[in-house]
Amino acid sequence: MAQEVSEYLSQNPRVAAWVETLRCEGETDKHWRHRREFLLRNAGDLVPATDETADAESGARTRQLQQLVSFSMAWANHVFLGCRYPQKVMDKILSMAEGIKVTDAPIHTTRDELVAKVKKRGISSSNEGVEEPSKKRAVEGKNNSSVERDHGKKSAKTDRSAAQQENSSPSRGSSTKSESGGTSARSSSSGSHQDSATSEGDRSVCSQSSSNSSQVTAGSGKALESEAPHKRGSASFVSSLLKSSMNSHMTQSTDNRQQSGSPKKGALEGSSGSASQSSSEIEVPLLGSSGSAEVELPLLSCKSSSETASSGLTSKSSSEANISSSVSKNSSSSGSSLLTPQSSSTNPSLLTSKSTAQVAASLLATKSGASLGSVSQLAAKSGSQSSTSQLPSKSTSQASESSVKFACRKLTNEDIKQKQPFFNRLYKTVAWKLVAVGGFSPTVNHGELLNAAIEALKATLDVFFVPLKELADLPQNKSSQESIVCELRCKSVYLGTGCGKSKENAKAVASREALKLFLKKKVVVKICKRKYRGSEIEDLVLLDEEARPVNLPPALKHPQELL
C-alpha cells in the first residue's frame, strides 16, 4: 500500500506538494507516512484542482481541511502513542482509517484490559514469592526505624502512662526561681484565674482565693460558699490539725513570698497554687499514712529524716487562711489547699464534689499512725519525715484515667464521606502507576509504588511495626517469635497488614495486600469491627465494593489515637 501511495504522488506532483504542507514540524517519517495515507484517503474534493484554487480556498473548505487534519493526528496518536478519545471520536477515526495497514505499531495495554487480564489469571493470596525490596528502600527504612520503634513502645505502655498524666491538678501558675538559705525557692509571680475545674467527675476540684479578706472563690463558682454548716465543722478540724505543724515551718512576710523545698528529691509533683493578681494560695495534698501501701490516693512516702518539703506564700493585702479539699471520682483521692493566716484569725472553707464523709475518711486515713506528711505547705514534725513523691493509683481509677487520654467517639457516615473522595483519586493514581510498570506482578516494588501514589496526592503513608509476640489476638508458636507485623494506614484509614522476618519484608507484604484492593472495580471506606488488645473496636477500613470483611487482622494502634 505504501508503494501505491508513492506511485500516486509521483504521478501527481501538485497533490504531493499540497499534502506536504500538512506535515507537522518534527514529525517522524514513520508517523507521517501513515498519516499522509490517512489524509489522501479522506481528502476527497478537498484536494485543489489547480494552484490558483489552492491559494484561494473558501472558509468552508478551510474548516473541513482543519477537521481532517485533526482526525488524522488523533488517529496517529491512538495508533503510535496509545491515546484514547471519546467514543464518538474513536468510532469516527477508526472508520476513516479502514484499509490502512500499520505493521510496526507498538502494543498498548489499557487499564481495563489490564484489570481483565489480572482477574482472568487470578491472584495468589499467599505470602510466598515476595522479593526483598531494593537496598535503597532498606536504607530509607533504617532512617525511619527510630520513629517506628517509638510507635511500638508507646503502644505497649499506654495504660501505665495514662495514670501518671492525669494525676496533676488542672490549676496553673507562672513562677520564678530564687535561692534562700541555701535551698531552692520558688515564688509565684502572677496567677492566672481559673474559670472552671469541676467539668468532669474524674478531675480534681481546685479552689482560689480573692484579694478581699472575707471572700472565698472556688473553681466551680461562688455559689459553693453557701454550703451546709456541717462542712465548716470538718474544715475547722482540718485547720486545727494542720496548724501545729504549720507554725514551726512556715515563715510569713507581708512583702516577700517565699517557698522552701528539698533541692532534688523534694521536687514538687503535686498541684501548684492558682490565685488572682493580688492574692496567693497554697495547695496541699491531703495527709496520708506511710504504713498503708494500697491507699488509693496520692500517698506521702517517707524519705530521709533530713528531707522536708514546705512552701509558704504570703500576700501583701490579704493573708486569710483558706483550706479547700478536692475529691475526685474515686472516693479515696482528695486534696486540700491552705492560705497563710492573718493575725491568728482563720476562716476555712471545705469544698467537696461528693460528701463530707468521704473527705473525713481520706483525712483520717492513717492506719498505722506512724507519721504525718505534707507535700507543698507543711514540713514534718520533729520525729516525722515527709516528701513530695506521688504514687499512681492501683485501683479502678487507673482505667478511668487511661480512658480519657484520647476522647473516644463513635464513627459515623460523616467520617466516611470525608475520606471517600481521597481514595477515589488514589484509585486512579494507583491504576495509572500500575499501567506504567506493566501491571501487578511479584517483581514490582509494591511499597515504593503505593508510597509514590500517595505522595502524588500530597498525603502520607503511615507505617506501624509491632513484634508478633506482643499481639494477644494472634496464635503464638516458636517459629513466629521473631517475626514483625506491619500495618499501613493513610488518612486514618486501614489499608493492610503484613508479617515478615524483618521490617522491610513485613512492609512489602502489607503493601502488596493493600495494592490488591486497587485491582477491583471500586474501593470504598467502611466502618468495621477489629480486635485491639482483646476487645472489639471500630475502625475505618478500605475495602473493595463487593468485599465482606471477615476476620480482619488485629489493630496495632488504637484508631482513635490517629484521628
Curated annotation (Swiss-Prot):
This protein's record includes keyword Chaperone: no
Compartment(s) where it occurs, according to its Swiss-Prot or TrEMBL record: Nucleus, Nucleoplasm
Domain XRN2-binding (XTBD) intervals: 19-126
Entry protein name: CDKN2A-interacting protein
Record Pfam families: XTBD
Family per record: Belongs to the CARF family.
Gene Ontology biological process terms, A to Z: DNA damage response; negative regulation of cell growth; positive regulation of cell growth; positive regulation of signal transduction; regulation of protein stability
Function: Regulates DNA damage response and cell proliferation in a dose-dependent manner through a number of signaling pathways involved in cell proliferation, apoptosis and senescence.
An annotated Gene Ontology molecular function: RNA binding
Keywords: Acetylation, Isopeptide bond, Nucleus, Phosphoprotein, RNA-binding, Ubl conjugation
